[in-house]
Amino acid sequence: MKYLYFVLLFIACNRALAQTEAVGLFDYHGDIGHPKNAGSAQYDKVTHTYYLKGSGYNIWFNRDEFQFAYKKIKGDFTATAVFEFIGEKGNDHRKIGWMIRESTDDKSIELNTVEHGDGLTVMQWRSLTGENMKDPEGEIFYPEKKFEVIQLQRSGKKLIMRIGHVGGPLKTVGAHEMPNMPDEALLGLFICSHDPEIVEEARVWDVHIEQPAEK
């Protein structure tokens, strides 16, 4: 019995360590909201590509479940990357993109810039901890679908989403003021399967996070 206890403790410690290891530009990664199936994040140093695996019921209502590769960031920034699901088949509501959130609490204040499995492009947010995300007043849809490049920019309390195709100009999806988002927050890449029984995969590359020089 004691042997089994130490084996389980060893497995738990290894999993916890894996969840906090740096991945490329990001200091941490892990599952938010305790999804049924564990996700992962890896970085290929040769191709500068991130590989994300994630499950989770959704990023919606008053709590979230997803895999998150993230770092702490303070002040203004511009984050840009190219996103692609691995595998053509999957839930039309599976999600990848950029996210900024107050904390790793599953009910945290957050804003995400999303590309869905069916190509739907949207900016959505939770303004207060534990608040239900609202449709349609808590999101901005773009009329066109299927873009690869997603950009999230913060200027003061304003967050701006832009999208585009590789090599093309960026188009603005919308902007939203987040007065309750702290100056120091968590920024990163995410994936959610929109199905607790499934683990989805995505690759992300050409990842850049730029911040203005300190005055």
Predicted regions and their residues:
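Bacterial Sec-dependent N-terminal signal peptides
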Residues: 1-20
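Extracellular glycan-recognition regions
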Residues: 19-215
